[in-house]
Amino acid sequence: MAAAPSLTVTLKDDSQVLNDVVVIGYGSVKKSDLSGSVVAIKAEEMNRGAVTSPQELIQGKVPGLFVAPGNGQPGAGSTIRIRGGASLNASNDPLIVIDGIPTSNDAAPGTPNALATINPNDIETFTVLKDASATAIYGSRASNGVIIITTKKGSQGKVKITYSGSFAAKDPYQRVPTLGADEFRSTLLGQYAEGTAQGNAVRNILNVYPNQSTNWQDAIYQTGLSTDQNIAVSGKAGFLPYRVSFGYNNERGTLKTASYERYTGAINLSPKFFNDHLSVDINVKGTINNNRFADAGAVGAAAFFDPTKPMYTCLLYTSPS
């Protein structure tokens, strides 16, 4: 029996693009193999402009993620909900994970939460886990979803200095319509003529300050000003990639005496050892917040104050001698 002829087989190269990889609590998996609902937002996909808080970076970018602004106080934390609330009494805030470390998002009313204290210029990516499968990674505290934040790290190239700054101004866009001083006096005279107003009250208003006119809403509101300044230095010193950043944010509220000031600093070192088999990440972050709260009750009170009265009065007393 004759031997079979030899065969020459040539394999042709076939390049394929690898599937997306998603970093989760316990490692990395292919996006196609991950059963949970995950949305990853990179730096180039985030919102641009005068952004002063991390919530503003992803607002409107993630389906099912609801971001409601705070009470208007400068620096107030936003309310974040992933696919609505699940409890009437317990917290509905999602779990915030910063560089692999879970943090509490609880805060007193009107004060910044954990997410609001982060400098948005230090954030590299957001990953939002939106369904109950997140509890398999982080436990029951992730029942309201998870927001994973990865901050920027040192680069492998030359030293790079980055600066960004912004200034903004805002005015109260809506005020309560009220009567002016002359309209108020005319209304009282009409009520007195109809017998629905007491004569003594009408005489006091007409005679004590006959020409006084005060807009109480103008007295409590002001033009809100804000500035945000950030500088970062990144590079590699020998085998040590590093990134150092500083940020300053100052906001003056539209309600007088309301202000917020934030100082942030971050140091990131990411060396590798044993021929890149061992990676070490060292992150040091610090935040200083200074809040001055305005009396929010002044907003409602200004709509009911008498426009015929002055803001300040001076009483002169003569001594008996």
Model-derived segments and their meaning:
Residues 317-321:
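Conserved small/polar residues in nucleotide/adenosyl-binding loops
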Residues 291-311:
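Low-complexity intrinsically disordered tracts that form flexible linkers/tails across taxa
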Residues 1-267, 272-288, 296:
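Short, small/polar-rich motifs associated with maturation and membrane association
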